């Protein structure tokens, strides 16, 4: 992407909840602003509760999942990784208690939405300028946040494991291979991951692989055998069994359903509404 863009959490799902609820990453920076409800995020393997007036900053290529809950509503601003507006180089979860700060960020989001919806000349430049303003708001908010306690050994281990998953999920490396790289046993890694994320070490890796697979299946026309090879599966048959086991559907069924969903007038209308 070349310009900042804003959308609702529903739009960020692109018609499929798994796009947010499975472990994955974005090629761009993202700032999530919750305005209603209560959800759960797992960021770099650490589980966090996300509530109203919470801001979640996700630098590009940060592994995360987000479940906003049935009543959750929020807005997302995606910024290009190469954007001139400075963004933090680590994930942040901020609870914005100051009413003025809450109103300021909401106003920036609403201004960006208006520009996108009106599609006037030079609207992309205006949205980028508002994204720069959002960056200033963010840095000011960071100054007023209480200092975070130093991460413990368990959290550092899980974050390092999440980084390895994100870097090597399209390879043949197993959870045991990553544990060996980190200098711990698979049992210890599993125990720590489950305590901090609610998921085992193997489940974190599986979710990331599944997201990558479903994205290529549903958003591309590549042959299934090619996708299997790109993601480090030993064969197309094993890839198909993996998808069937975790989704209950074959890769071809998933692709057909995704195309039908995109072609649906209801889905098209939902993508247009903010």
Which role does the model predict for each range below?
Residues 196-236, 256-274:
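Terminal helix-turn-helix DNA-binding modules in bacterial transcription factors
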Residues 2-93, 120, 124:
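N-terminal regulatory/effector-sensing and dimerization cores
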Residues 53, 189, 238-239, 243:
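Short hydrophobic/aromatic patch on the recognition helix
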Residues 182, 231-232, 243:
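Core residues of bacterial helix-turn-helix
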Residues 176, 187, 223-225, 236-237, ...:
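Residues within helix-turn-helix
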Residues 87-110:
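Aromatic/histidine-rich interaction motifs
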Residues 184, 233-234, 249:
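The short coil/loop that forms the "turn" connecting the two helices of the helix-turn-helix
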Residues 95-100, 119-126, 136-182, 195-207:
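Short, Lys/Arg-enriched, Trp-marked, Pro/Gly-tolerant hinge/linker segments that flank
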